[in-house]
UniProtKB/Swiss-Prot annotation:
Required co-factors: Mn(2+)
GO CC annotation terms, alphabetical: cytosol
Gene Ontology MF terms in the entry: L-arabinose isomerase activity; manganese ion binding
Family annotation (CDD domains): L-arabinose_isomerase
Entry EC number(s): 5.3.1.4
Name this protein carries in UniProt: L-arabinose isomerase
Protein's organism: Escherichia coli (strain K12)
Length: 500
């Protein structure tokens, strides 16, 4: 059972009565065949549900209206099997508030060269029916996704599946509640922002809860529940001597388990799926939540430190998008650099809170070590290195008049040396196209020091996310050149300025 099982995507066929009942009967048969095949063979994350043909303005409007009010409907896939005059779609598309994908396909893959006649031509008109539909989208200034390819093509399946992930993520985001335990880290700019504007743009709500409210729930957790969770720790992780049953830091592990159970109960009771903490506001907690946060992220919760609600929300959104995909997704921070000619590296980490979903080790190390920041007892944490391979880091920032998504494509590498004195999980990567270009572009674009790191998602996923939410995206990859990048920032400023 995954979040995708809670949603479905409606498959809508556009046609008209001009061609007669026999043609419409064949269109319906083709649609049933295609939907059944896609549900069976395409490995789509969501079920496709075939809706009645849209052959009149009233029928199309009814489908779009019903989609809006059906909470299970994540979006619409539209196929213009025959020519479907696009004025019929205006009212429906005007009111539609669910994501829309135009599947530019046709039932047959090859033309029947010896038998093709006008009946065949009239039945299979995607080539120009799709263009008519595209015009009305452009005329109405409504962005929608387009996938071209035969319905049996695996690449088309993958693209539809990727779009479905975005559509479900968007519906989940509309119901997302972000809990901030405490406020923003004092005097920090980029982690702050306009929460009302965010709720208007994305749908998620952000509210603050006193740490004392959390502490009450933490203190209500029974010793039996704590011991049961620590037994789980024993089976899942490599425990250092200090954390084992007679170790000198065993009590810190028990307290970390109590915090995890209390946090999870608080989040579940409030319907929260993302949260933040700050080391400046830990009143009543015996340690900064480290292990608890790591494990909650692995369970799908969004998180960011220092009150950074935008990154916490983005992490949850990306967790939903990547459900079931290979590779993990985590809160991250660009921490420090390794400058070496031709081998510049970024070491990413945070004080404690890196998600084990990106761990290279099957059993991370569970340890308790000193943490000066926060002024509390030594916190428990998981320590691990990160899987190697292509990845991305993404940052969502508030520019006042709009949101900007920054994405840097990176290549994670194996740590060339052991890190015996580094008591936190970490990731090591090469930034594309190189560290000087990537860091300068990131700084010029205003990217945050907090990011979401993902092996599971790629640049195309984030482009789709930006398009679906109608926000700016700024990309730093192997094709980035600083002069052109600066020009793009200037052009974007003008473009979005005109749209205000």
């Amino acid at each position: 059972m995954t979040i995708f099982d809670n949603y479905e995507v409606w498959f809508v066929i556009g046609s008209q009565h001009l061609y007669g009942p026999e043609t419409l009967r064949q269109v319906t048969q083709h649609a049933e065949h295609v939907v059944n095949a896609l549900n069976t063979e395409a490995k789509l994350p969501c079920k496709l549900v075939l809706k009645p043909l849209g052959t009149t303005p009233d029928e199309i409007t009814a489908i779009c209206r019903d989609a809006n009010y059906d909470d299970r409907c994540a979006g619409l896939v539209v196929w213009l099997h025959t020519f479907s005059p696009a004025k019929m779609w205006i009212n429906g598309l005007t009111m539609l508030n669910k994501p829309l994908l135009q599947f530019h396909t046709q039932f047959n893959a090859a033309l029947p060269w010896d038998s093709i006649d006008m009946d065949f031509m009239n039945l299979n008109q995607t080539a120009h029916g799709g263009r008519e539909f595209g015009f009305i989208g452009a005329r109405m200034r409504q962005q929608h996704a387009v996938v071209t390819g035969h319905w049996q093509d695996k690449q088309a399946h993958e693209r539809i599946g990727s779009w479905m992930r975005q559509a479900v993520s968007k519906q989940d985001t509309r119901h997302l509640k972000v809990c901030r335990f405490g406020d923003n880290m004092r005097e920090v700019a980029v982690t702050d922002g306009d929460k009302v504007a965010a709720q208007i743009k994305f749908g998620f709500s952000v509210n603050t809860w006193a740490v004392g409210d959390l502490v009450q729930v933490v203190n209500s957790i029974s010793d039996g529940d704590v011991n049961a969770l620590v037994d789980e720790y024993e089976s899942c992780y490599t425990m250092t001597p200090a954390t084992q049953i007679h170790g000198k830091k065993r009590q810190n592990v028990l307290e970390a388990a109590r915090i995890e159970l209390g946090m999870k109960r608080f989040l579940e009771q409030g319907g929260f799926h993302a949260f933040t903490t700050t080391f400046e506001d830990l009143h009543g907690l015996k340690q900064l939540p480290g292990l608890a946060v790591q494990r909650l992220m692995q369970q799908g919760y969004g998180f960011a430190g220092e009150g950074d609600w935008k990154t916490a929300a983005l992490l949850r959104i990306m967790k939903v998008m990547s459900t079931g995909l290979q590779g993990g997704t985590s809160f991250m921070e660009d921490y420090t650099y390794h400058f070496e000619k031709g081998n510049d590296l970024v070491l990413g980490s945070h004080m404690l809170e890196v998600c084990p979903s990106i761990a290279a080790e099957e059993k991370p190390i569970l340890d308790v070590q000193h943490l000066g920041i926060g002024g509390k007892d030594d916190p428990a944490r998981l320590i691990f290195n990160t899987q190697t391979g292509p990845a991305i880091v993404a940052s969502l920032i508030d520019l006042g008049d709009r949101y900007r998504l920054l994405v840097n494509c990176i290549d994670t590498v194996k740590t060339p040396h052991s890190l015996p004195k580094l008591p936190v999980a970490n990731a090591l990567w090469k930034a594309q196209p190189d560290l000087p270009t990537a860091s300068e572009a990131w700084i010029l674009a205003g990217g945050a020091h907090h990011t979401v790191f993902s092996h599971a998602l790629n640049l195309n996923d984030m482009r789709q996310f930006a398009e679906m939410h109608d926000i700016e995206i700024t990309v730093i990859d192997n094709d980035t050149r600083l002069p052109a990048f600066k020009d793009a920032l200037r052009w974007n400023e003008v473009y979005y300025g005109f749209r205000r």
